From Swiss-Prot:
InterPro entries: 4pyrrol_synth_GluRdtase, 4pyrrol_synth_GluRdtase_dimer, 4pyrrol_synth_GluRdtase_N, GluRdtase_CS, GluRdtase_dimer_dom_sf, GluRdtase_N_sf, NAD(P)-bd_dom_sf, Shikm_DH/Glu-tRNA_Rdtase. The gene is hemA. The record marks 94 as: Important for activity. It is an enzyme of class 1 (oxidoreductase). During catalysis, the active site Cys acts as a nucleophile attacking the alpha-carbonyl group of tRNA-bound glutamate with the formation of a thioester intermediate between enzyme and glutamate, and the concomitant release of tRNA(Glu). The thioester intermediate is finally reduced by direct hydride transfer from NADPH, to form the product GSA. One of its GO terms (molecular function) is NADP binding. Pfam families: GlutR_dimer, GlutR_N, Shikimate_DH. Substrate binds at residues 49-52, 104, 109-111, 115. CDD domains: NAD_bind_Glutamyl_tRNA_reduct. NADP(+) binds at residues 184-189. This is Glutamyl-tRNA reductase. It comes from the Bacteria. The active site is at 50 (nucleophile).
Amino acid sequence: MQLTAVGLNHQTAPLSIREKLAFAAACLPEAVRNLARSNAATEAVILSTCNRTELYCVGDSEEIIRWLADYHSLPIEEISPYLYTLGMQETVRHAFRVACGLDSMVLGEPQILGQIKDAVRVAQEQESMGKKLNALFQKTFSVAKEIRTDTAVGENSVSMASASVKLAEQIFPDIGDLNVLFIGAGEMIELVATYFAAKSPRLMTVANRTLARAQELCDKLGVNAEPCLLSDLPAILHEYDVVVSSTASQLPIVGKGMVERALKQRQSMPLFMLDLAVPRDIEAEVGDLNDAYLYTVDDMVNIVQSGKEARQKAAAAAETLVSEKVAEFVRQQQGRQSVPLIRALRDEGEKARKQVLENAMKQLAKGATAEEVLERLSIQLTNKLLHSPTQTLNKAGEEDKDLVHAVAQIYHLDK
């Protein structure tokens, strides 16, 4: 089995497909353990974000696709048009590019590196990684650090979090006059809330499954923020001008009916809703309602392109460095694969040496002169070491030119 990657991202699949193949954080440990113990793979790392789901494996790509479809209870023909399958060298290049932010919706964005590290940590905890994936991701982190240090690929990057505020400012003239509701209390919500807090909105509320986690985030924000439970949403939604949601829920949290009731109470005042979750937290039908402005991660593309031209110049230098690092990694791995062969070759040489030496000692014991023994020893050793290569070459003839060329290279006969 070889190193391979199977996946889809914002470039190959719409949100409606990506959300079907996303892995909830709570399910990821069991999923990666299951994959690494299946017929599809012997090693596995699963990366699942709002913009991509990728399975890095040592395994059979066709079986991995079948496992992915079975896991999500989807027919293969429904998902296969959106998937990419990568060979060994392509997988290495892709991992490097993703970690550097070169394959992101926001060119050079830094969050993806942390997400990969989290995916690797989960895989390590589940013992689903072996030598090949450990080597790949150790090198991936090293390359990402070097590229982000030596190039400007991540500079002037507009993050999804900062873009959320920019989008709200296109609808409302002053964030300071708004009530803002955050649904969820994870990393993405914390980032977005931090940007909104800098604009000093009139009120910020964090709704979460547990009140303690919501309160913890409110304390971090250090502004006029209060916690509430998800179960409170139907009663309070109408009080907010901006709603930003990003949870790990597999089902929508905010439905069309809930928003309809809130809009009636708001008496035609606009409601800006940003759904950053995959799968979606807010029902897509909400976007059909008058005065409800619903945006998803795919709608953020144009906003996050700010500063892209400057980053693209830096990306060209980063791509060159990635190519160099891919070639370096592949050479290292091929060298390691040769180690057992080298060891076996040396063992054969040692075996021949001992046999010839044993014969020489017997001849010396019988009274043969040292010169005679050394002469025979050298002839026997030459014959033993060259017998197998000579036989193989005789059988190969002109039909196997690669073998003939390889032997010529090994013995430096092609000069």
